[in-house]
């Protein structure tokens, strides 16, 4: 199988579709249209023009980086594409992260990321979240 690797964000519609297909939480098209251009880095994998895997890095570009939106179409899971997405992300991070930079993620599949060298921070730290009502 031939895959095309593009270091660009997908379209907002593709992004929203792949998130849902891969089992991630749904995002509105409006949110995606605002968020994607603010990515520090993105990798998209395509087969015959269709988006089948993706991942992004967001943050301030120096002190904090967050790995987000790592998703693989269920029809292509188990082929190493998630690992390839993370290899591209890790190459980017290794080229820009400074001493003391903090790289984080909310890992839906911690065992997958641990195989790639990422470590759980608990019990020394705990992830937290807070939901806000839509502003529109």
Functional labels for PLM-detected ranges:
Residues 31-71:
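A conserved beta-strand-loop-helix scaffold within acyl/acetyltransferase catalytic domains
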Residues 113, 118:
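Conserved active-site tyrosine of GNAT-family acetyltransferases
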Residues 63, 108-111:
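A generic "binding-loop/recognition-motif" signal
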Residues 100-104, 119-136:
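Conserved catalytic-core motifs of GNAT/GCN5-like acyltransferases
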Residues 86, 93-107:
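Conserved GNAT acetyl-CoA-binding A-motif
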Residues 76, 80-88:
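Conserved acetyl-CoA pyrophosphate-binding loop and the N-cap/start of the following alpha-helix
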Residues 1-30, 124:
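Short amphipathic alpha-helix that is part of the acyltransferase structural core
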């Amino acid at each position: 199988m031939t895959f095309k690797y593009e270091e660009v964000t997908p379209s907002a519609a593709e992004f929203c579709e792949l998130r849902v297909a891969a089992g991630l939480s749904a995002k509105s098209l409006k949110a995606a249209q605002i968020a994607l251009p603010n990515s520090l880095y993105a990798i998209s994998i395509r087969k015959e023009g269709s988006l089948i895997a993706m991942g992004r890095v967001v943050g301030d570009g120096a002190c904090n980086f967050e790995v987000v939106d790592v998703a693989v179409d269920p029809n292509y899971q188990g082929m190493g594409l998630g690992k390839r997405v993370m290899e591209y992300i890790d190459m980017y991070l290794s080229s820009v992260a400074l001493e003391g930079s903090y790289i984080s993620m909310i890992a839906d599949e911690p065992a997958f990321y641990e195989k790639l060298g990422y470590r759980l921070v608990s019990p020394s730290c705990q992830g937290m979240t807070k939901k806000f009502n839509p502003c529109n």
